[in-house]
């Protein structure tokens, strides 16, 4: 099954997340199909960028967003 989830980037105590489309059986940070955005919770204000067109495309073909991605995308 295809999922949309966060993958952690950055360094110790300075996380930065990519919003990626991947297979649900893969590990969190392993290979992904497509990167559709990013989320940076460290800076003020928090930065979120999602390619809405690609996000909606992946939802239309059956990808399931994680709870956190769902929450972020609704903002």
UniProtKB/Swiss-Prot annotation:
GO cellular component: cytoplasm; small ribosomal subunit
Entry-linked PROSITE patterns: RIBOSOMAL_S16
Any GO BP: translation
Record Gene3D superfamilies: 3.30.1320.10
InterPro entries linked to this entry: Ribosomal_bS16 (IPR000307), Ribosomal_bS16_CS (IPR020592), Ribosomal_bS16_dom_sf (IPR023803)
UniProt cross-references to Pfam families, sorted A to Z: Ribosomal_S16 (PF00886)
Lineage top rank: taxon: Bacteria
An MF annotation (GO) of this entry: structural constituent of ribosome
Keywords: Ribonucleoprotein, Ribosomal protein
HAMAP family the record matches: Ribosomal_bS16 (MF_00385)
NCBIfam families, alphabetized: S16
Entry similarity comment: Belongs to the bacterial ribosomal protein bS16 family.
Protein name: Small ribosomal subunit protein bS16
Naturally occurring in which organism (per UniProt): Aliarcobacter butzleri (strain RM4018)
Origin organism lineage: Bacteria, Pseudomonadati, Campylobacterota, Epsilonproteobacteria, Campylobacterales
């Amino acid at each position: 099954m295809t999922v949309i989830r966060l993958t952690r980037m950055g360094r110790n105590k300075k996380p930065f997340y990519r919003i990626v489309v991947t297979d649900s059986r893969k590990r969190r940070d392993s290979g992904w199909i497509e990167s559709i955005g990013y989320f940076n919770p460290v800076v003020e204000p928090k930065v979120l960028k999602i390619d809405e067109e690609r996000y909606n495309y992946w939802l239309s073909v059956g990808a399931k967003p994680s709870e956190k991605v769902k929450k972020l995308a609704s903002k």
